[in-house]
Amino acid sequence: MKKAFVKSYGCQMNVYDAARMVDLLGREGFAETEAMEEADVVILNTCHIREKAAEKVYSELGRVRDLKGERAGAGRETTIVVAGCVAQAEGREIIHRAPAVDVVVGPQSYHRLPELLARARDGKVVDTEFPLDDKFDHLPPRRVAGPSAFLTVQEGCDKFCAFCVVPYTRGAEVSRPVAKILAEAERLAAGGARELTLIGQNVNAFHGEGPDGRPWSLGRLMRRLAEVPGIARLRYTTSHPRDMDDDLIAAHRDCPAVMPYLHLPVQSGSDRILAAMNRRHDADTYRRLIDRIRAARPDIALTSDFIVGFPGETDADHAETMRLVAEIGFSGAFSFKYSPRPGTPAAESADAVPEAVKRERLAALQALIDGQARAFNLASLGRTVEVLIEKPGRHPGQVAGKSPYLQAVQIEAEPAVIGTILPVRLTRAGSNSLFGERAEAAPAAAA
């Protein structure tokens, strides 16, 4: 049997896309392998959001090239595929830089992967089109790999933030029809999924056509998904503050299946930098939005994204970001040094912040956020929460899962409980996860 190896970089959407590529190849007789040296097809599903992520791909391609040569010496062929957002952004340039690559395919074209592999027998293939047909109509039924599953409901972004390549690599905002989302959710639930995470580049801009022929909001979609038998938990990511509407906030208040967790990137606390980023909101608008969300769901855990060292950022701008973080209090965040992405407006700025200053600001911000994350976890100790058990734990006799607040939790239990939701009393905080013991029942969340 032919084998395929897939390595995915970056966001949850890439994780989802990688799984769908495996499904596609499975229909063609391929088995997935975790050992690259065994693979007849090697796929790197790439991320272009930061320069470091893109350069990692070329470094990995050097290793794959060497592997391809070794296998050729043993009489075995290897087809190398670069997929994802680097493929979309750089196209044929990838083959110029890495001639061992056979196929370059963008995120809107990977449903044609079997066809592209067949064409690659006759030469290099590049497909970075934005086809008019819906790629989801060409994908095979999902495989369920555990009690938690990603479900794509929206793709693309129309916001055009000055630092971001997503509108160029993923295209304009497109929402899937509600009927197709529900059908996929029902298949996932029938396969054992208990939790669905709805994903999209700008997921709360969802406006898919409902059965009534009218666009549905994300809040309405989540209420309907909560009615799917077997689905106990719903999450969504990633959101933009401008699309966080009253209906979605109300879903956090009124729909028990919607978990008390929200990832809502703000990027900066400085109005001047937010304007330069083309975020189309200011810091106080974000603060007021958080107040409304917390009024609806007081126990909600909030995480965010931050960029430090954006062109023109001053010490005063950075201080505003630190002030916003201190005032709001996050359970975690992703923070990065700004890196210019080719083709974006910010990449043309001459007002670069020195690398040493970026490093210093990033260290200060991460120290503040790490302290808040530790405080959030420590405040959870002694509480009883419902944990979705997802997989075996780090050590024999342990299982691991997630709290409603997306905290990793380890408990002592037999593997038979995987896929169930258990009440767990949290007893200890480690560096990356919480530890607990089974309890009688979890109390109701704060209202």
Swiss-Prot record:
HAMAP family for the chain: tRNA_metthiotr_MiaB
Residue ranges of every copy of the Radical SAM core domain listed in the record: 143-375
Family: Belongs to the methylthiotransferase family. MiaB subfamily.
MTTase N-terminal domain: residues covered: 2-122
Residues annotated as domain TRAM: 378-440
Cofactor note: Binds 2 [4Fe-4S] clusters. One cluster is coordinated with 3 cysteines and an exchangeable S-adenosyl-L-methionine.
Any one GO MF annotation of this record: 4 iron, 4 sulfur cluster binding
Binding site for [4Fe-4S] cluster 1: C11, C47, C85
E.C. designation(s): 2.8.4.3
Keyword Iron-sulfur assigned: yes
Protein name: tRNA-2-methylthio-N(6)-dimethylallyladenosine synthase
Residue sites binding [4Fe-4S] cluster 2 per the record: C157, C161, C164
GO cellular component: cytosol
Keyword line: 4Fe-4S, Cytoplasm, Iron, Iron-sulfur, Metal-binding, S-adenosyl-L-methionine, Transferase, tRNA processing
Catalytic reaction equation(s): N(6)-dimethylallyladenosine(37) in tRNA + (sulfur carrier)-SH + AH2 + 2 S-adenosyl-L-methionine = 2-methylsulfanyl-N(6)-dimethylallyladenosine(37) in tRNA + (sulfur carrier)-H + 5'-deoxyadenosine + L-methionine + A + S-adenosyl-L-homocysteine + 2 H(+)
Subunit composition and interactions: Monomer.
